[in-house]
Amino acid sequence: MTRVKRGKITCRTRKKRMQSVKGFRGAWSTLSRPAMQGSLRALNYSYKHRRKNVKTFRRLSIVRFNALIRNSGLPFTYNRLIALINLYNCRLNRNVLSQLGIRDSNTFTKLMKFYYH
């Protein structure tokens, strides 16, 4: 049986793995096996936290909405506002409305009063 030398492939794989764990501390940035574990862990956490970010920013936009509605003096809350917007088929999504409220609160208040009456 012929001899199979895998040095190049192994070196290439390890080099790629070590480049992906630059900045890690301890053995995770210097040794091959812990580096593999560390990179897999990092990829797993990055996936989880991307999903978590969506929930966090949604929660933030709801808090912003409630604050903006209270400041405008209208007698309803976030869930009532979303129900009215869906009722009138408003094409602006929650993120756009939240940014509108932050950047131009007068227009936001006029828009909410339009949907309220």
UniProtKB/Swiss-Prot annotation:
It holds the Pfam family Ribosomal_L20. Its main location: plastid. InterPro entries: Ribosomal_bL20, Ribosomal_protein_bL20_C. Keywords: Chloroplast, Plastid, Ribonucleoprotein, Ribosomal protein, RNA-binding, rRNA-binding. GO terms for biological process: ribosomal large subunit assembly; translation. CDD domains: Ribosomal_L20 (cd07026). GO terms for cellular component: chloroplast; ribonucleoprotein complex; ribosome. Signal peptide: none annotated. HAMAP family: Ribosomal_bL20 (MF_00382). Binds directly to 23S ribosomal RNA and is necessary for the in vitro assembly process of the 50S ribosomal subunit. It is not involved in the protein synthesizing functions of that subunit. This is Large ribosomal subunit protein bL20c. It comes from Bigelowiella natans.
